[in-house]
Amino acid sequence: MCIRDRYNPEHQFLASRGYAVLSMNFRGSTGYGRNHVKMANGQWGRKMQDDVTDSVNWAVEQGIADPDNVCIYGASYGGYAVMAGITKTPKMYKCAVNYVGVTDMGLLFSKMPKVWEIWEEQQKIEIGDYDNDKEYLDAVSPINLVDRIETPLYIVHGVRDWRVPIQHAQKLRRELEKNGKVEGEDFWWMVKTDEGHGFYKEANKMELYTELEEFFGRYLKDS
C-alpha cells in the first residue's frame, strides 16, 4: 500500500526551494512491522487520513509549519490522501497536487488490473469489499465530495496508467466543472499521453516540476 519513507529527489527539490517538507509514514506504511500495516485495514479516508492531519498539526505546533501556508502533494495512494485532505479538512491547505491519485473507490475496484486479481481477497481486507462495504467506500470516495473542495488543485496523470486509470482524473475534472470550478482558475490539469503511473521521461518531468514550482510559489507566501 505504502512504502517506508527514504531518500526522495522530490523532497530535495522542494527543500531546495525553501519549503519545509513533511513526509509521514502513516499507518499502512511498510517498514514498521505487521501491526503498523494492519492498523490501516478499512481505514482509507478515516484513521489513515487522520494520521496526515495530525502530522500537519504537529508540524504547526512545533513551529515547523505556518498554518496559513500549508500545501499537500501526493501520488497514487498519496494522491487519494490529497483528495481526502481537501474534502475532509478543506480549510487546512492553501493548495493541493493530486498526482496519479485514486478519486473514485468504485472505479478502483471495477478497473482493478488483471495482475492484481491474485491479491483481490487481500485488497478486500485492506481497503474493503465494494459489494459489502459500498456505503463506507462511497462515503470516503473523493469523487462524491467534490462540492467540499475550496483548495486550488493541480491534477497530474498519465494516459497509460494501468494502476490508477486515467478515468479517475477525467471523472474528477468533470465533477469539478459541474460544481462551477474553472480550469486555470480553480484547478489545473496536466495529462501526458506517453506516461503511465508517474512521469519518467525527462522532458515531462522537467515540465511537471517547473509547473509545480510555479504553483507552490503562487500560493505559499514567505512568512
Predicted ranges, named:
Residues 1-3:
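Short, small-residue-biased leader/transition segments that mark boundaries at the very start
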Residues 5-17, 23-223:
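Active-site-proximal cap/loop segments of hydrolase catalytic domains
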